[in-house]
């Protein structure tokens, strides 16, 4: 997760009670607390997220690190820590709270048999906050400083585990806010791709929604990008959220006079009508939905400005 607005918008993990076969799924979460050595091996793997890094990503993640991408992976592994009893007790309590709501609402959520939890300094992601890979969640080593946010935090991150590992679930969730999933990834010009700022929780650029821009309906993909090369400092200083118009038939970004067209979200008059107003974490549909999911699984649904998003989500999870 690129969590620049976080503590208020995140989280999930839960505890389950039943043992199941390795390939089975569970409606609730069974947390597995990884030891430092095992966690380090996972963070040292070059997965799809790392392989897809842009030039900007590589430059911004390897400041002061020798060896390029491989040096970064070694650095990431070195950031892992062992869980202590107080932390595991807190996460188990949060898990049980979330699982109780799942059962009360009779939700059917295709969680993996267990959700692995890794403790890290998160320096590998610029101290941004929590994020996910595969079926594991990487949590910051300072959870005990703000225990009141942990349940939301875990529920938010668990959503990313679900969408990454269940295409049908992802498609169903994205449709709640009007996003469609394309049969293949969108093709962007290299000049824009190399300025993308990657989010570990966003699987791929293959979704779009229709927005009204300058009075015209346009099919657009949301992207996080920089307008300039990396020149030092936190990558959050460079972060921009854009809407790139696409041709949904060819799955290609639309260019004008040889340049990629990128609109700001403020140019879409119906942006918040589409995304809802339950969260300010609007950098990607994945994050908007994850925040709404965390609200649903923590029971924090009273008085929301866009209750219809939560209602549709609950119905879709049954």
What label would you give each PLM region?
Residues 73-134:
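Auxiliary, metal-adjacent structural segments of Zn-dependent hydrolase domains
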Residues 175-318:
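Metalloprotease/metallohydrolase-associated module, dominated by Zn2+-dependent proteases
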